């Protein structure tokens, strides 16, 4: 479908915004305070440590549980494909904590991208062209990458502390149902990764994958998954 400028106003304050790079901290931020309050600090710190060493983790996200790693580490990304038994020609999603990070990894971000992120009422993954600075085996053959800004407290703080995009692919073997909760994760996946986050393991409410929207450079929007 074509983008309609009459229905959605541009977010001029987002366009070209530069990202400050503060020292990661759990204090002084809304997400960080929530993480401390819920006892997530040690869990997040260990997950970040493992990913910075090239490891693979299982973690709760704003949608279903995910398999994650440093999205700039090609060897770690390769392991995610192997663990998931997924064809490496199928690109994976990256999770970030703020839309201000997008311009670090996407050259020439279309104005409409900011609008799509602002109006989204549910977790929404946006596929953008001209990916840069990410593991080559994470980027699609056409040079695009799927990115999602998480608003969920745990995964948001995890991304913030990592200071890089984190791979976020559903915690299941390719072709099998996604793990909506921790209890749904197959034992072989739990054994295959380097760290399994301890937070949010007791949740039982159903979760679903995100919407996926592909955004072309000319502003054309295609809905891949509602």
Describe the residue ranges of each PLM region.
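Active-site-adjacent structural elements in enzyme catalytic cores
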Residues: 2-16, 32-226
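Glycine-biased, low-complexity coil/linker segments
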Residues: 27-29
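N-terminal amphipathic/hydrophobic targeting modules at extreme N-termini
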Residues: 16-18, 23-24
